[in-house]
Curated annotation (Swiss-Prot):
PANTHER family: CONSERVED VIRULENCE FACTOR C, PBS LYASE HEAT-LIKE PROTEIN. It comes from the Bacteria. GO terms for molecular function: oxidoreductase activity. It comes from Bacillus subtilis (strain 168). This is Uncharacterized protein YpgR. It holds the Pfam family Virulence_fact. InterPro entries: ARM-like, ARM-type_fold, Nfu/NifU_N, Nfu/NifU_N_sf, PBS_lyase_HEAT, Virulence_F_dom.
Length: 377
């Protein structure tokens, strides 16, 4: 068994290693470092590499997952060595204390519709962040008036963010404080304490029509609370356009998330605007949305993002061009080939190789999945 090629995936922390041999149909194996003894020799060697978190083997490829604090430029030569293809150069651990490719998963522990605490994890590290006293008081009231708190508490996933744990924790707790006013907490507490079927419906998130004037409130927490309870539709684009100019980063980022959910061509100019936002988190989110939408009209905007100051934005732009780019991107990709960040440079080279060899763009992973489902219907 040898390596045919190594390709990036939608996650900067996973690489796809294409093999010359294929597993029997329907068979797959998932290996972790602690299971190395029972793994095939080649995979056992890969699991010994510093920074490798796991290997998933299915069909004709391996999905190698890394710890975000380790560089692929140190890991991949050792993966090739495990297959006997070439000797790995001795590489020192190269961890960045600045921006990381690490994906941080965000969870909020809920009790009858009321947030209790925030949990962040990158797969290796976990941190929890508490909420202010008023949230705890609401929980204490329900402990005495409702059923068993252990039974009713549950972790709700809030998606993925990038960056420093403390920064993300601060942002998420601040957003929850804004979204759950004293009035909303009181309403949720009273409804949950009833313990009836209709009460359970009452504590669920209620969407309402957000108007332009609601975003004029001087208190950013009230502006965010309105936006948080929006059910975004195409008719809400003018409101989201206004939110993109809000001085609060959390509001601009939430507006971008909603624009990505709408997905119609009308949102593209606004996502292009968000790609130039002064806040990196907003630009990253805009890039993710454009990648998920996968519209070739975004090629010029993503070409421009190849020179963004954030390596994550540059990586996302290169990934987009790999997925849907055409000949118009070749010049910019050639200029970006020697990006100082290994992951960005690799993704740029992959995009350039696909386009120059005349291979048809496959579209984003989400688009491929959608088309696959349609064919199966």
């Amino acid at each position: 068994m040898k390596i045919k090629s190594i390709e990036p995936t939608p996650s900067p922390n996973t690489m796809k290693v294409i093999l010359t041999e294929e597993l029997p149909a329907g068979k797959s194996n998932n290996y972790k470092p602690e299971q190395a003894e029972g793994a095939p020799l080649v995979i056992a060697e890969i699991l010994k590499i510093d920074g490798v978190k796991g290997v998933y083997h299915v069909a004709d490829f391996l999905a190698v997952e890394r710890n975000a604090r380790y560089d692929w430029k140190d890991i991949l030569p050792q993966v090739r060595t495990a297959f006997g293809m070439e000797s790995a150069e001795s590489a020192e651990e190269n961890r960045s204390d600045q921006e990381s490719f690490g994906e941080v998963k965000v969870f909020v522990q809920m009790f009858s519709g009321i947030p209790m605490q925030v949990k962040l994890t990158d797969g290796e590290r976990e941190e929890r962040f508490g909420l202010p006293e008023r949230f705890q008081q609401a929980i204490l009231k329900l402990r005495s008036e409702a059923s068993n708190v252990v039974f009713e508490r549950a972790w709700k996933e809030q998606g993925v963010r990038f960056g420093d744990f403390d920064e993300i924790g601060h942002d998420v707790t601040e957003e929850l404080q804004a979204a759950y006013s004293d009035e909303r907490l009181k309403r949720l507490t009273e409804a949950a304490a009833q313990g009836k079927g209709e009460a359970k419906q009452a504590v669920q998130r209620k969407a309402y029509k957000v108007t332009l004037d609601m975003l004029d409130d001087e208190d950013w927490k009230k502006r965010y609370a309105h936006l948080e309870q929006m059910d975004p539709k195409e008719e809400d684009i003018p409101v989201l356009q206004k939110a993109l100019d809000d001085p609060k980063v959390s509001i601009r980022r939430q507006a971008v998330v909603y624009l990505g959910m709408i997905e119609t061509p009308d949102v593209l100019p606004l996502l292009y605007k968000a790609l130039e936002d002064k806040a990196v988190s907003v630009r990253r989110t805009a890039g993710d949305c454009l990648s998920d939408i996968g519209d070739p009209q975004a090629i010029p905007a993503m070409i421009k993002s190849l020179s963004d100051s954030s390596k994550l934005v540059r990586w996302r732009a290169a990934m987009f061009l790999y997925e849907v780019g055409d000949e118009s991107a070749i010049e910019a990709l050639r200029a970006a080939e020697d990006d100082p960040e290994f992951e960005v440079s690799l993704q740029v080279k992959m995009a350039l190789e696909r386009i120059e060899h005349g291979e048809e763009a496959k579209g984003s992973v989400w688009k491929q999945m959608t088309e696959s489902r349609k064919k199966g219907e």
